[in-house]
Amino acid sequence: MAATAVEFQRAQSLLSTDRNASIDILHAIVKRDVQDDDEEAVRVKEQSILELGGLLAKTGQAAELGGLLKYVRPFLNSISKAKAARLVRSLLDMFLDMEAATGQEVELCLECIEWAKSEKRTFLRQALEARLVSLYFDTKRYQEALQLGSQLLQELKKMDDKALLVELQLLESKTYHALSNLPKARAALTSARTTANAIYCPPKLQAALDMQSGIIHAAEEKDWKTAYSYFYEAFEGYDSIDSPRAITALKYMLLCKIMLNSPEDVQSLISGKLALRYAGRQTEALKCVAQASKNRSLADFEKALTEYKAELRDDPIISTHLTKLYDNLLEQNLIRVIEPFSRVQIEHISELIKLSKGDVERKLSQMILDQKFHGILDQGEGVLIVFDEPPVDKTYEASLETIQNMSKVVDSLYNKAKKLT
């Protein structure tokens, strides 16, 4: 069996020069039957399976990797349950993390869960179900994610697998946030952080918790300073393990600076030592938005959104907050434009801020309803008539003050009468 170990070493040595040859050698080792009592052969085969899985994932061979996951099932009885669970999870993670989606992800995951059930491997089944919840979330099947997640949470709370419980509670928080149910998203995140405090959290999981904390603070409380701190922690965590999620955390840090009206900090962040290695279109997109925000330029803002559509619009977190920022910028521009006028043509306003007449009309209507300024739209004439700010009626405040003073007088008289008796 020493020959198998030599073959494995040869496959590893060919990784950098001839991947196909390396894959062929590993395929041969994996297909070879081994005796259960031959520990060395079993160990080499286990390593070969993982190495082959990694190579198939890197070369985008999704179908072959899915086939490998099914093919190795008989071999899993030759190794301990813990090793078998690690092997299945590793191969499934490789398959699900591949960018070349096959559409078979959910089906393969369900197959693995059924196999784990038939083999009575409870811990593996729970881990695979948690991965399926994550998959449902990624594919926007939120109700299915919540349904399966809820069942699994009840089960895990009775057991001692706190790491998996944290992962699931975090997924629950993300799902509720995606459904815009912020109170439940916050409650699930609080549960996840409480559970995480009782165990050692791997850097990846801790970074994910920090990331979600930042997202919730930004979404619910608009507390951008606290959100920035969490995103920074998440960025450092992801950066320490070379995770591709680090660039997302960096983008959210830049977004916080823009929302805090500190667009000048964006450039210093991008050119900082830690973030320099992530320079590219992702950071350039936020840099353009920061510049547009600094100049209060709607045209530059729209240009950035068009030019960097994938980087800005495809991320729901960034897209949501940039939409709000754009609305605020539009309102500020409109108020600045109409300030000198008591009566102005809508056509003239649209020319000044370089937007279509329909868009300007809709926004002005909304601002009037929200009482951002006082006026009416005369659509027949195509003009906006702006009124002076009506004087604030202070009768209510004066009445409250009078009642307050009378209350003090009555209390004082009561205390004096009490002393006399």
Swiss-Prot record:
Entry GO MF terms: structural molecule activity
Compartment annotation: Nucleus; Cytoplasm, Cytosol
Principal localisation: nucleus
Organism: Danio rerio
GO CC terms of this entry: cytosol; nucleus; proteasome accessory complex; proteasome regulatory particle, lid subcomplex
Any Pfam family matching the protein: PCI
Record domain PCI: where: 227-391
Subunit composition and interactions: Component of the lid subcomplex of the 19S proteasome regulatory particle complex (also named PA700 complex). The 26S proteasome consists of a 20S proteasome core and two 19S regulatory subunits.
Single Gene Ontology BP annotation: stem cell differentiation
Role, per record: Component of the lid subcomplex of the 26S proteasome, a multiprotein complex involved in the ATP-dependent degradation of ubiquitinated proteins. In the complex, psmd11a is required for proteasome assembly.
InterPro entries: 26S_Proteasome/COP9_Components, PCI_dom, Rpn6_C_helix, Rpn6_N, TPR-like_helical_dom_sf, WH_DNA-bd_sf
Protein keywords: Cytoplasm, Nucleus, Proteasome
Family, as annotated: Belongs to the proteasome subunit S9 family.
Phylogenetic placement of the source organism: Eukaryota, Metazoa, Chordata, Craniata, Vertebrata
Protein name: 26S proteasome non-ATPase regulatory subunit 11A
